[in-house]
Amino acid sequence: MQQFTIRTRLLMLVGAMFIGFITIELMGFSALQRGVASLNTVYLDRVVPLRDLKTIADLYAVKIVDSSHKARSGRMTYAQAEQEVKDAGRQIDMLWHAYQKTKKIDEEQRSVDALAKLVDEAQDPIERLKGILERGDKAALDTFVENEMYPLIDPLSEGLSHLTQIQVEESKRAYDAAVVLYDSSRTMLALLLLGILICGGVFATRLIRSIIHPLTTLKDAAARVALGDLSQSIQVSGRNEVTDVQQSVQAMQANLRNTLQDIQGSAAQLAAAAEELQTATESTAQGIHRQNDEMQMAATAVTEMSAAVDEVADNANRTSNASHEAMDLADGGRKQVMLTRETIDRLSGKLNETTRTVFRLAEEASNIGRVLDVIRAIAEQTKLLALNAAIEAAHAGEAGRGFAVVADEVRNLAQRTQTSTQEIERMISAIQSVTQEGVRDVQQSCEFAARSQTMSSEADQALTLIAERITEINGMNLVIASAAEEQAQVAREVDRNLVAISDISEQSTAGVQQTSEASEELARLAANLNNLVNRFSM
């Protein structure tokens, strides 16, 4: 992994996490779309047909039968009863044709074919009933109601009841399929998310180690340099931002070692010159000329030392420039981390859109619930109508017994409709619960995106620490440059002293003592330089 730059490694981590979360989002969208399609099928092919079948059953059992009985008992005129029967016939035709256009299973289609024959066979008796009501023939109406009405209506009611039961069973099957779809989608998403988290965790751990280990090595090397240990070389491996800094510090260490070696050599030369100068001062006056020659040699050595010090200053300046370049690279890494955080923010926006989609699904489920409320209200009204019909049949005595049977069947049908509506309500509640769990899953994905953003912030902090360490190295370069400047000043001062000693030696013999003192000062300076260099282990 050291062969890749930190930027490349971070992009690989974020890219892998981004692809994983996009995959989860697409799978979630797919599951939601299939769930919406299932709900749409339940509503259009089951709930609406259930409503229409219930209405058709009510039209046969309430409108036609009830109007006939009311016309017999005189509570409704024959013209009103005829109009009620005609209206019921038109509504039955309209609803029946609409129902036949819906999607059906094989069992349902067979029941529809059988019921269609009964509906067609009922047309002629109903037309005769219309004619009886139009003529106002009470005897014919009594005969029709007692002999033909219930043999006509009862098979129709049974067929409609059977179709209603099929709608309920198919709604239950659709619900079971939706539950299976939800369970499989949830398991798949959970496994995929777990795999992404495990892979991301392993990759992130390796990434952190690949950054921390070379930084720790670099820190230890810098600490050794600060303690004066220049004997151990810095190991450089890989091609990334950290290795660039390692190479810069390695070059700085080598330059510092060479500089100290030059200083050590110059100090040795200076010590030798001082000893020679001391020997010359102990000689007789005849040795003054020879002493001047030695002074010239000492001046030459100081000049060489000054040149070496200038070279040290130049090396320190080049090291400072390398540190600035490393700082620029660290700033570039921080900018890449900022781009990574922006990418994660866009991912969070996509997850928020997914949440809004799930909420719309919940709203659609609530709309279905309102439709069920309407169906339940119709069932309650039907039960009340059946109860009223039973009461009226009881008032009619023996003549209303058949009508009482029909009213009881209508009430039972309304009760079954109400029970089916409650079952569908439970299904809708389960779907809403599943939708809420989907919202929580998407919110967890948002939290994982936020954690990825936190990891990017930590990488930014790591780059900031690198920049701080580079600043410290730059400060060390400034210290080295300052020391070199001080050494140059000392060399120039020594040169001036040598010139003064030479002048004094030429003027008088008394200057021999002063020259001796100057030579002793030079010896001390050489010893100090040696002590300073000996602090470093090379």
UniProtKB/Swiss-Prot annotation:
Disruption phenotype: Mutant grows on naphthalene but is not chemotactic to this aromatic hydrocarbon. Mutant has a wild-type chemotactic response to succinate, benzoate, salicylate and 4-hydroxybenzoate. Residues 31-187 are periplasmic. One of its GO terms (biological process) is signal transduction. It is found in: Cell inner membrane. SMART domains: HAMP, MA. GO terms for molecular function: transmembrane signaling receptor activity. One of its GO terms (cellular component) is plasma membrane. It is a multi-pass membrane protein. Residues 266-502 form the Methyl-accepting transducer domain. The chain crosses the membrane at residues 10-30, 188-208. Residues 1-9, 209-538 are cytoplasmic. InterPro entries: Chemotax_Me-accpt_rcpt, HAMP_dom, HlyB_4HB_MCP, MCPsignal_dom, T_SNARE_dom. Residues 209-261 form the HAMP domain. It holds the Pfam family MCPsignal. Keywords: Cell inner membrane, Cell membrane, Chemotaxis, Membrane, Methylation, Plasmid, Transducer, Transmembrane, Transmembrane helix. Belongs to the methyl-accepting chemotaxis (MCP) protein family. Chemotactic-signal transducers respond to changes in the concentration of attractants and repellents in the environment, transduce a signal from the outside to the inside of the cell, and facilitate sensory adaptation through the variation of the level of methylation. Chemoreceptor for naphthalene or a related compound. May facilitate biodegradation. This is Methyl-accepting chemotaxis protein NahY. It comes from Pseudomonas putida (Arthrobacter siderocapsulatus). The gene is nahY.
